[in-house]
Structure formats: structure tokens, C-alpha cells
Amino acid sequence: MDRRIFGLENEYGVTCTFRGQRRLSPDEVARYLFRRVVSWGRSSNVFLRNGARLYLDVGSHPEYATPECDNVTELVTHDKAGERILEGLLVDAERRLHEEGIAGDVYLFKNNTDSAGNSYGCHENYLVARHGEFSRLADILIPFLVTRQLLCGAGKVLQTPRGAVYCVSQRAEHIWEGVSSATTRSRPIINTRDEPHADAERYRRLHVIVGDSNMSETTMLLKVGATDLVLRMIEAGTVMRDLTLENPIRAIREVSHDITGRRKVRLASGREASALEVQREYYEKAVDFCERRGIRTGTVERVLELWGRTLDAIEAEDLDRIGTEIDWVMKYKLLERYRAKHNMTMSHPRVAQIDLAYHDIHRRRGLYYLLEKKGQAARVANDLKIFEGKSVPPQTTRARLRGDFIRRAQEQRRDFTVDWVHLKLNDQAQRTVLCKDPFRSVDDRVEKLIAGM
């Protein structure tokens, strides 16, 4: 598929503290956060003018699902726009709390684990053709996804009985299956629940729940861009070496616990290979595939360049070469500088605090944004485009139809209901339009519905 629909869903961790102590329960904080949303949307589950969905997920985690995007750079922009929307809710919630005499700071963390060991996710969505063999897709994809954390892990200080260790991925400890239809109970690598949000005869939605949430725009670009290239190769029938893992769940933890990428994992064939070797295999295939097919877009070239350079840097143990572009490396360097300066072990509570503060989405407070201000975080999006993305949908996908419909209905104060595929006016006629093609950004039926308001 040369043109693909992408979407990202990020759940955020939430807390409210006063002088270091927890002030409100997550449920209470979430209520304050969503008060403004509920006041205009009459619900804590709403679609926005930019085509995105914002809602309160299980366990009081705010979740933002980007609108449908058909290129990875735009996806990164819209994911960051979601961050900004939530930052706005955070500022609003703090103001309301102070007005009610409750002193405290509200924090939203774009990470995947809390101090109690709970995990919440970053889900990636890729539209794939229905006619392909899904089991073959999963077989080729799983070794890639298990080792992909070397490219796009968010990094984590993991407390173990033998002291704290730095891991590549936050999510790796919480994955229990390879392929499954559950997302919370068993946490698979690929979720098979078949909800295409599109014409089910033509498409299915590949739902990857193994990845970490990313603060870094370049890491996000690499994560989704490399996965897209692997999918394109599978769809084109590219012959791949069998890299099936003997035990993907053990392997994902082994890879996460080794920042050198050299630790060998067992393959089903009885051979052993390191995460670097597995990734190198996919990378070289992707380079060859793009050359043979003449795939030469700026995004693809940037993805391939960063993918190769990341593998080279890890192999050479020269992480400075990717020190502004890969989340787990950026955080690791930050922690190592701090530890050296204050002569601390990895187990020190201050180190855990810095680990968390990297993911604080408040731009005046979060450590990732401190790096960005200092020019130590490479960019993909720009601030103007991100600001636009808060209210303007992508113009080349179905999200445009949804966003335009919502904008018009709100301006006309009309009661409406929308989801990913339906647009409905709640009037006597109950007029509804079903939009099954996520690639279509122009539709006479929708225009008629909008014009009739």
C-alpha cells in the first residue's frame, strides 16, 4: 500500500500533588481536567474539530486519538497537537482548583508506566488490505516489533531486587502475548480485534500496542515510518529470512534490558541473533526494497537514514550520534549527566523523578521540552503547524469531512453525533452519512448535510 492511513492513540498518566504529596485521586484530577470538555460536549468522550477523539479511558487516563493521517510527518504533527490540547486542559484544571481553594500542581505524563507498576499504552494503527494473509503479516512483523524498541523505546529506570537498571522500553515488562484480541488483560504485541473503521471487505486495521509513547518527534517518525516500510515489503511479497522468535515475550524483556543491543535471543529455528542483527536484517531489506521500487520521498529517506544511523551508533557504542533524536538515548544521557554531577546511583529517588519529569507535557516544566528549548531535541513538526493541528483536520483524509461537519454543527448550535465512520444530525430527520472510505476527503453527501444546517 503506497498510501496508507495512520493513527496514534496515546493514554496519559495523571496526578495532582502539593509539596510532593498526592493531593487528589486520579479520578478527581480527571474530572477537573475534563470539566471544560464535558461542559460543551456533554460527555467525556468527544470528537474535536480537528477530527481527533479525546476521551477518558479506563483507570482515569485521558486518551487522545489522532485524526486519520496519510503521511507520517502529518501524524507526528497531530500527535503533538493532542499534547498541546491536553496541556491546555491541564492549565485550565489548575486554575479551577486554585479558584476553589485547592492548592496543587496538575501533571500529565506522556509515558507508559506509573509508580504502582500499572501500564497504559500508545497504540499505533495502520490500515492494511483485507486480502492479505494476516497470520503471515503477524509472523514477519513480531520479530521486527520485539526488536524495534532499540529504535523507539522511551527508556525507563526499572527497580529490580538487585537494584535499579536502565531499560530501553517502558512497555516491554507489560506485554504478555504475541497476538490476541485483548488490550488490557493480556497485552499482546499485535491486537487482532477486527474493527477496521472502514470498509471491512477491503481493509483491516493493524493495531500495534507494543510501542512506547514518544516525546521525541524524530523517534515517533522512525517508529511509524520503519513499520510502514516493513508492512509495504510484506504486502509486496518480499521474501524475508525466517526470524521467528522461540519466545517473543521473553525476548522482548531481554532486548529491553540490554542497551547495547548485543544480547542474543533464541529463534524458533534454534539459531540465536541479537536485536541489532534482527533490526539490521529488516533495515537492509528496506533499503534494497526502496531502491528497487524507486521510493524516494523526503520522509522515507529521513526514516532510512535515521534507522541506519541508530543501528550504527548502538553497535559502535557511540550514542552521541543519536543523542538528540532517540528518546531512550536522550533520557539516558540526561540521567547519566545528573548522576555524575551529584554522584548518585541509578536507584536514587531523584533519578526516578527525572525519569518521570522527562515525560511531563507542560512545556515550561517538562525535561524533554527543556532539551527542545536548548536545541538538544531534533524536530519533525513545527510549532505553527502543531498549533493549526489543534483545530484544523488533515485535508487529504476522511478526518476533513468529520472536522468540517463538527465545526459547522457547533457554529450552528446543532445537536450531532459522530464516530469514526458516521456523521449524524440529531434532528427529526436523523440524517446520517456513513463514510466508509478513510482516504476520501471530499463527499457530496457530507457537503449536502453541512449546507443544510
Curated annotation (Swiss-Prot):
| GO biological process assignments | modification-dependent protein catabolic process; proteasomal protein catabolic process; protein pupylation
Q: Which reaction does it catalyse?
A: ATP + [prokaryotic ubiquitin-like protein]-L-glutamate + [protein]-L-lysine = ADP + phosphate + N(6)-([prokaryotic ubiquitin-like protein]-gamma-L-glutamyl)-[protein]-L-lysine
Q: Which residues bind ATP?
A: 53, 66, 420
Q: Name the domain of life.
A: Bacteria
Q: Which residues bind Mg(2+)?
A: 9, 55, 63
One Pfam family, short name: Pup_ligase
Coiled-coil region(s): none
**Pathway in which the depicted protein is active:** Protein degradation; proteasomal Pup-dependent pathway; Protein modification; protein pupylation
**What are the positions of the active site?**
57
Is the keyword ATP-binding in the record? yes
Q: What else is known?
A: The reaction mechanism probably proceeds via the activation of Pup by phosphorylation of its C-terminal glutamate, which is then subject to nucleophilic attack by the substrate lysine, resulting in an isopeptide bond and the release of phosphate as a good leaving group.
Q: Which family does it belong to?
A: Belongs to the Pup ligase/Pup deamidase family. Pup-conjugating enzyme subfamily.
Job of this protein: Catalyzes the covalent attachment of the prokaryotic ubiquitin-like protein modifier Pup to the proteasomal substrate proteins, thereby targeting them for proteasomal degradation. This tagging system is termed pupylation. The ligation reaction involves the side-chain carboxylate of the C-terminal glutamate of Pup and the side-chain amino group of a substrate lysine.
Q: What is this protein called?
A: Pup--protein ligase
Question: What's the source species for this entry?
Answer: Streptomyces coelicolor (strain ATCC BAA-471 / A3(2) / M145)
